[in-house]
Curated annotation (Swiss-Prot):
NCBIfam families listed in its UniProt record: ac_ald_DH_ac, PRK08300.1
InterPro entries with a match to the protein in the record: Acetaldehyde_dehydrogenase, Acetylaldehyde_DH_C, NAD(P)-bd_dom_sf, Semialdehyde_DH_NAD-bd
Listed EC numbers: 1.2.1.10
UniProt name for this protein: Acetaldehyde dehydrogenase
Gene3D superfamilies in UniProt: Dihydrodipicolinate Reductase, domain 2, NAD(P)-binding Rossmann-like Domain
Originating species: Escherichia coli O139:H28 (strain E24377A / ETEC)
Keywords: Aromatic hydrocarbons catabolism, NAD, Oxidoreductase
Amino acid sequence: MSKRKVAIIGSGNIGTDLMIKILRHGQHLEMAVMVGIDPQSDGLARARRMGVATTHEGVIGLMNMPEFADIDIVFDATSAGAHVKNDAALREAKPDIRLIDLTPAAIGPYCVPVVNLEANVDQLNVNMVTCGGQATIPMVAAVSRVARVHYAEIIASIASKSAGPGTRANIDEFTETTSRAIEVVGGAAKGKAIIVLNPAEPPLMMRDTVYVLSDEASQDDIEASINEMAEAVQAYVPGYRLKQRVQFEVIPQDKPVNLPGVGQFSGLKTAVWLEVEGAAHYLPAYAGNLDIMTSSALATAEKMAQSLARKAGEAA
């Protein structure tokens, strides 16, 4: 099966890590162009050393390159504001081009591969939510397939060193996009997301805490669902793991808790603690937040490439 050519816009931490993953592990993808805006960026320099065509003139530079004619899929690892402009420009030049959005812009539907990739494989633009979303939404979905989820709250703690300027500029968008995706993809009636940039030295690995309030259900069934979901995520993010056993607390009807925006709640509280270790393709292993974003985007693009190849075969 012929490989589909891809470009990456954004030569920062996420874009560079993704490029290395495609070059090393791409099965149906061929790395064609790395796009940046800083001619001195490490990502562009590394791309050139690895034999990848580059431009430092942004999306306009990409569209002016001869390689652009053959590109089927573009990853955007810039910022939420830039992605809106990039999508418009690329869509005008190539209406059927596929965009995988690694910013919180969310023009297209949210995609968390283990939960809803099959439903979104033919979309022209998919949004990879956020690193916190990719790590925690599978856990919310694991509970919601067993019991009705009224509220889910996630806290993502990442090493400050792993957060580049794009991540820092998009903190508000991070919380908004993740909260919404907890509801839309995770199945919670109400979602909340919190991000912590941990300045500790040496840097600590990505840690995520997930609290889910649901109708009462079998705790064994919920724990089994969570363990099964964690294994499914590990298929494309090997460093993803439960830090300890799932914890449960029954909130009785005569002692309900009051949730802002939700009201009185009684039922089952499920607590999940996660750790995400990075594959250290570009940044060290503590940057699991980068790894889960780039691994999820890669898994999505691989499925898209297979779908495009099948369609091309059917058309022929």
